[in-house]
């Protein structure tokens, strides 16, 4: 386990926090766009040598404390029999979404066999980075994945799944359970392949009421995190005021989106480490302002139990020099 990450998870005082960035590998880098001229997104994530090259591009540029595998939260749809593709301007589109309660009965295939390329990618990454760099695996959360397969694509409200919860609660829970079971296998697979940290992205769980999150999602999060023996991070958007629910999930670290005041979060969560939470839009400012805002965030978070990150993924059009300024701000904070 990478030392700086381990110390942050343990709550030890640090001269600076470990730093990485959600969507760290990807579209804002010109070298990434060159690769994508030859490979589609799905081809790139399912070809380990290409996915490893993409993952390592920001590692070579910015020297982050963690590299997050280049993959997608929807990869686990395949073993459950869902097909999807990407549409320009739309994003992921599920080709056979849930249309009835019967569609929530999902026997699944062999995760390690069907997603063999994920394990090989992690093995390549652990061999490529130095011992002080954490290799981060990840997975989508059961609510977010269920939302995608019910709606068929991204949505502001994911009303199809929320309606299923109201009209056919047994089918709703059956779908959540199907994803929970496969996610347990998937994160165990990533851990066995050599991942140092696992982040669970249940990004849209904040659409639920606190009572529904507590009843339907929290027990399933706990099951997933109980299956993992390495450090874990949970992330969901729009959870300000309900951070205690994320802290109860069993994850070691609570990820914060940019709408949360980090000082308030530290007070509410006590000794629970946090991750985040610079607004990704701030990376469109001048590099000097990016540095200033990043270092202000580091100061507000305190000298222990903090992993520096954005409050969500870096935007595709973010200037590369501003991404560099974000990482430089962290590295220079220790000087």
Regions picked out by a protein language model, each given a short descriptive name:
Residues 89-128:
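A gly/proline- and charged-residue-enriched helix-loop-helix capping module
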Residues 117, 121-335:
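Active-site loop segments of alpha/beta catalytic cores
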Residues 82-85, 91-92, 266-272:
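Glycine/serine-rich loop-strand microenvironments at binding/catalytic pocket rims
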Residues 85-98, 155-162:
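A charged helix-plus-loop insertion that forms the helical arch/lid used to bind
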Residues 42-46, 105-115, 173, 280-284:
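The substrate-binding groove and active-site-proximal loops of carbohydrate-active enzymes
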Residues 40-41, 98-100, 261, 279:
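Short, solvent-exposed coil/turn linker segments
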Residues 1-88, 124, 128, 218, ...:
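N-terminal basic, low-complexity leaders that serve as flexible interaction/assembly modules and, when applicable
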Residues 73-76, 91-92, 100, 142-144:
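A short acidic, glycine/proline-enriched capping/turn motif at secondary-structure boundaries
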């Amino acid at each position: 386990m990478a030392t700086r990450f381990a110390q942050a998870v343990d709550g030890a005082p640090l001269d600076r926090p470990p730093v990485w960035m959600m969507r760290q590998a990807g579209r804002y880098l010109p070298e990434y766009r060159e690769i994508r001229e030859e490979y589609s997104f799905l081809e790139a994530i399912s070809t380990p040598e290409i996915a490893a090259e993409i993952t390592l591009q920001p590692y070579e540029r910015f020297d982050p404390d963690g590299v997050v595998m280049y993959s997608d939260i929807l990869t686990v749809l395949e073993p459950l029999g869902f097909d999807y593709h990407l549409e320009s301007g739309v994003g992921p589109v599920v080709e056979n979404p849930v249309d009835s309660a019967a569609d929530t009965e999902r026997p699944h295939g062999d995760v390690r066999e069907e997603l063999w390329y994920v394990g090989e990618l992690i093995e390549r990454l652990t061999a490529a980075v130095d011992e002080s760099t954490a290799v981060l695996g990840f997975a989508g959360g059961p609510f977010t994945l269920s939302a995608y397969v019910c709606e068929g694509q991204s949505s502001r409200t994911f009303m199809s799944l929320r309606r299923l919860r109201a009209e056919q609660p047994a089918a709703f829970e059956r779908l959540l359970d199907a994803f929970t079971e496969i996610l347990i296998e998937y994160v165990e697979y990533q851990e066995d392949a050599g991942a140092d940290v696992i982040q669970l992205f249940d990004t849209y769980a904040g659409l639920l009421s606190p009572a529904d999150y507590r009843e339907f999602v929290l027990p399933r999060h706990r099951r997933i995190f109980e299956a993992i023996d390495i450090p874990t991070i949970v992330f969901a958007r729009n959870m300000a005021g309900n951070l205690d629910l994320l802290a109860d999930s069993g994850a070691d670290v609570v990820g914060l989106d940019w709408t949360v005041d980090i000082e308030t979060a530290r007070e509410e969560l006590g000794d629970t480490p946090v991750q985040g939470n610079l607004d990704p839009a701030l990376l469109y400012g001048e590099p000097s302002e990016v540095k200033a805002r990043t270092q202000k965030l580091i100061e507000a978070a305190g000298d222990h139990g903090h992993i520096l990150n954005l409050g969500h993924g870096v935007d595709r059009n973010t200037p590369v020099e501003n991404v560099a300024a974000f990482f430089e701000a962290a590295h220079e904070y220790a000087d």
